[in-house]
Amino acid sequence: MKNKELNLHTLYTQHNRESWSGFGGHLSIAVSEEEAKAVEGLNDYLSVEEVETIYIPLVRLLHLHVKSAAERNKHVNVFLKHPHSAKIPFIIGIAGSVAVGKSTTARILQKLLSRLPDRPKVSLITTDGFLFPTAELKKKNMMSRKGFPESYDVKALLEFLNDLKSGKDSVKAPVYSHLTYDREEGVFEVVEQADIVIIEGINVLQSPTLEDDRENPRIFVSDFFDFSIYVDAEESRIFTWYLERFRLLRETAFQNPDSYFHKFKDLSDQEADEMAASIWESVNRPNLYENILPTKFRSDLILRKGDGHKVEEVLVRRV
């Protein structure tokens, strides 16, 4: 039987907003409206009500997993007679389409997790920094494939994750500028002795094909994750959010002379919409269906969004 014929929804328990909100229990983490807006992505939506209804229960669930992993590691280290083993961070992966709101989810989780009673140190890394530099992509004639799996320096990303899980004291990741549409040369995000590391990116749940495994057996990014989240929505909604974001960028970031897209600052509304639609159809939509959406059911939890970026349903994997 082909995977597409399987009803993979049965792997998950499904919860609407009302039932999910009840799983927050007695966990209380204060977040102001200003703080919620500060982590909100461009054209995204995050209110205190959304934090309390969706993210507090999620943080409680994540905390259970973090504590369970720490307890398991402690017992395994005793068994192996390594009582003073290096500190190993709990890694959370967050995947989903362009414009679906992954960054907002990642940032609010970082803030909330860091405010748990035991005050864990939480770092956030986006995989954008592991895109090959623009000059290299141009040299390989791959600019139209930017965001597709082959446009990432996967070897460097795997080395970064391997260093984290090996207990290395200090690990650094390259930083990406959405203004210049390129890596920031010589700029790095340093992760030092973190308790939790969040890895956010469109393709982080992708696995090698069977052909890849036969020819070159290897591990992939998701093999380093202790918990994974997929931010989901209907394509029509995601496209609408992408279109709205493109319009906002034209009015803001594109006006900056340093912006890679400065040449598009004077586009009319119709021209901007046509360009956004063209990019969506030629790049983002194919990437969604070829590489991102097929990984949804590899996640431990799915946040399904509806109108206005509000999460309508939460799916939690049973096994």
Curated annotation (Swiss-Prot):
Its EC number is 2.7.1.33
**Coiled-coil boundaries:** none
Q: Which gene encodes it?
A: coaA
Mind telling me which InterPro entries this protein's record contains?
P-loop_NTPase, PanK, PRK/URK
GO BP annotation list: coenzyme A biosynthetic process
Q: Which Pfam families match?
A: PRK
Keyword Signal tagged = no
Q: Where would you find this protein in the cell?
A: Cytoplasm
What protein name does the entry list? Answer: Pantothenate kinase
- Which UniProt key words apply to this protein? ATP-binding, Coenzyme A biosynthesis, Cytoplasm, Kinase, Nucleotide-binding, Transferase
Report the GO terms under cellular component.
Answer: cytoplasm
Output one GO MF annotation.
ATP binding
SUPFAM superfamilies for this protein: P-loop containing nucleoside triphosphate hydrolases
| Reaction(s) this enzyme catalyzes, per UniProt | (R)-pantothenate + ATP = (R)-4'-phosphopantothenate + ADP + H(+)
- Where does the UniProt annotation place the signal sequence? none
Pathway note:
Cofactor biosynthesis; coenzyme A biosynthesis; CoA from (R)-pantothenate: step 1/5
Which cysteines share a disulfide bond? none
Per UniProt, ATP binds at 96-103
**Membership in a protein family:** Belongs to the prokaryotic pantothenate kinase family.
